């Protein structure tokens, strides 16, 4: 995948320690940072599927995980899911 690719990050609502279910981006910060570091433009898109994060490149889902499995906050450099997502985007056609 060329650098500066457009990536659509689709994310669903999730519940956090007694708080109501809603769309939050706190757990996406590391993933956003990793993709931005590679020069990708990331568009956020809310979806209704609970606990889901999907990365789409050229209309194809190249990565999917449970949003609760991503580390809360941070730069994403130590999060293995962020590394996996980065590689999936770089390998996308």
Swiss-Prot record:
Family: Belongs to the UPF0728 family.
Species whose genome carries this gene: Bos taurus (Bovine)
Family matches, as InterPro entries: UPF0728
UniProt name for this protein: UPF0728 protein C10orf53 homolog
């Amino acid at each position: 995948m060329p650098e500066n690719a457009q990536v659509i990050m689709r994310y669903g609502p999730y519940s956090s320690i007694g708080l109501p279910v809603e769309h939050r981006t706190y757990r996406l910060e590391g993933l956003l940072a990793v993709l931005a570091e590679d020069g990708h433009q990331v568009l956020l898109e809310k979806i209704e599927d609970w606990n889901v994060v999907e990365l789409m490149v050229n209309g194809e889902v190249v990565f999917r995980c449970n949003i609760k499995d991503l580390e809360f906050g941070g730069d994403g450099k130590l999060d293995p899911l962020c590394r996996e997502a980065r590689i999936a985007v770089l390998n996308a056609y």
